[in-house]
Swiss-Prot record:
It comes from Xenopus tropicalis (Western clawed frog). Residues 1-52, 199-232, 278-300 are annotated as: Disordered. PANTHER family: BASIC HELIX-LOOP-HELIX TRANSCRIPTION FACTOR, HES-RELATED. Downstream effector of Notch signaling. Transcriptional repressor which binds preferentially to the canonical E box sequence 5'-CACGTG-3'. Acts as a suppressor of neurogenesis by antagonizing proneural gene function. Functions during floorplate development. Plays a role in pronephros formation in the inhibition of distal tubule and duct cell fates and the promotion of glomus and proximal tubule formation. GO terms for biological process: floor plate development; glomus development; negative regulation of DNA-templated transcription; negative regulation of transcription by RNA polymerase II; Notch signaling pathway; pronephros development; specification of proximal tubule identity. Residues 32-44, 199-210 have a biased composition (Low complexity). One of its GO terms (cellular component) is nucleus. Its main location: nucleus. Efficient DNA binding requires dimerization with another bHLH protein. Binds DNA in the form of homodimer or more strongly as a heterodimer with hes1/hairy1 or hes4/hairy2b. Also weakly interacts with the bHLH proteins hes2, neurod1 and neurod4/ath3. Interacts (via Orange domain) with ccdc89/boip (via C-terminus). The Orange domain, downstream sequence and the bHLH are required for efficient heterodimerization with hes/hairy proteins, and for transcriptional repressor activity. Residues 48-103 form the bHLH domain. This is Hairy/enhancer-of-split related with YRPW motif protein 1. GO terms for molecular function: protein heterodimerization activity; protein homodimerization activity; sequence-specific DNA binding. The gene is hey1. Belongs to the HEY family.
Length: 300
């Protein structure tokens, strides 16, 4: 059976057409049998009802076709076959069912991990572009599989895609941070992004840095409250977070810092601090250290 467009319905449309033909035949029969008793207003109402039914059916078919198009775009297995083969309705629905079963088997992690889903589609798109590059080099440029330029380019793109997929897999394995205590005590956070606080940079020896680190961990040490957040040149904000267990910050501020550490994007492109603030903090002439977050702590 030849169809007019990609998503023309087959069985359901035939049934609906048969029902419409039956209704129209019944209406025509009633019209022929009771022609004398039917007024022109009644016949116009019947025609208007048939016209409305056709409009409603067309809108319903368009809604079904749009939903199938969205499923073909959202399901990864159907998205891979988008340019290579024409998919039937049953195939799209079957791929959708298989995809949902796979997500259910994985424990529902894919339902809520929007970043992982975006990375999945980015990897699929990169692989599609890689296949198009290889096809262009072989068909348009006439390069065979042993050509040095093609081998070098394709291997470079393959290695890049593999490295990004491995990095994304390692990055999305990080979960949320649970609180270990109430607000009356210091919460203990064991998160891989909350690294230990580095001591003040010293180029003299390793022992001096270790000694400064132990001074920061002492309860009465004045350096325990003077550690400042500094954004490194590479933009990784997680490596400069202070030790949470010995910090005097309130839990709401700590939760905001933890959410910043779990943010999947880099802050290297955002100018958060001036270059002068990247240097270690120096005491002011009054003897008190500079605390850029002092007003925020007072707000809590």
């Amino acid at each position: 059976m030849k169809r007019g467009h990609d998503y023309s319905s087959s069985d359901s449309e035939l049934d609906e057409n048969i029902e419409v033909e039956k209704e129209s035949a019944d209406e025509n029969g009633n019209l022929s049998s009771a022609a004398g008793s039917m007024s022109p207003s009644t016949s116009s109402q019947i025609l208007a009802r048939k016209r409305r039914r056709g409009i409603i059916e067309k809108r319903r078919r368009d809604r079904i076709n749009n939903s199938l198009s969205e499923l073909r775009r959202l399901v990864p297995s159907a998205f891979e076959k988008q340019g290579s083969a024409k998919l039937e309705k049953a195939e799209i629905l079957q791929m959708t069912v298989d995809h949902l079963k796979m997500l259910h088997t994985a424990g529902g992690k894919g339902y809520f991990d929007a970043h992982a889903l975006a990375m999945d589609y980015r990897s699929l798109g990169f692989r599609e572009c890689l296949a198009e590059v290889a096809r262009y080099l072989s068909i348009i440029e006439g390069m065979d599989t042993t050509d040095p330029l093609r081998v070098r380019l394709v291997s470079h793109l393959n290695n890049y895609a593999s490295q990004r997929e491995a990095a994304n897999t390692a990055h999305t394995g990080i979960g949320h941070i649970p609180w270990g205590g109430t607000f009356a005590h210091h919460p203990h956070l064991s998160h891989p992004l909350l690294l230990a606080q580095t001591a003040h940079t010293s180029a003299n020896s390793t022992s001096s840095s270790t000694e400064a680190h132990h001074q920061n961990r002492l309860p009465g040490s004045p350096h325990a409250e003077t550690s400042s957040l500094r954004v490194p040149p590479n933009g990784n904000i997680a490596s400069v977070l202070p030790v949470v267990a010995s910090s005097k910050l309130s839990p709401p501020l700590l939760s905001s810092m933890a959410s910043l550490s779990a943010f999947p994007f880099s802050f290297g492109s955002f100018h958060l601090l001036s270059p002068n603030s990247l240097s270690p903090t120096t005491p002011t002439p009054s003897g008190k250290p500079y605390r850029p977050w002092g007003t925020e702590i007072g707000a809590f």
